[in-house]
Amino acid sequence: GGKSRRKAIIVLSDGIDTAVRDIDREQMANLPDDQIPSAIKPETSDILQRVLNKADRQGVTIYPLALPTGDPAKLADPTLRQVAMYKAARARLQIIADRTGGVVNTINRLEEMGTLYAKVAADLRTLYTIEYQPINEKRDGKWRTITLETSDTALISRTKTGYFAK
């Protein structure tokens, strides 16, 4: 087989997408305070699903570098709604990384960026590609979950969480 090049995207972001933030804000608009922490379901964002579907089709691994400005713990005098939106934003970055086989790295100080980029580059150089033929040959467009495990404790097993059977 020929050697194929790995496709990866490094996303430098606080995770706060203004379009999604406005949708999150609408979801919480008339809720009492006790319902705010669980009001936003990060995985249900249409925008997030479009990003994930495109990444799936392109075979891209996404590595979010999370800026400190998106850390809910660093908000000055935050409201319940702000904390909920920032937590949802961080959760979306994690969902993107998990789904595409990447890793979220959190930047605490801007001086760390070079080290984090180097960490992603090292990760890309040490990944192995494993292919398999599924037993279920139906191309029904349904989501199929993947689990990869290794018995060698020196190895780290990380994979996309699944694929659409097309």
Locate predicted features:
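Scaffold/interface architecture of coatomer-like assemblies
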Residues: 1-166
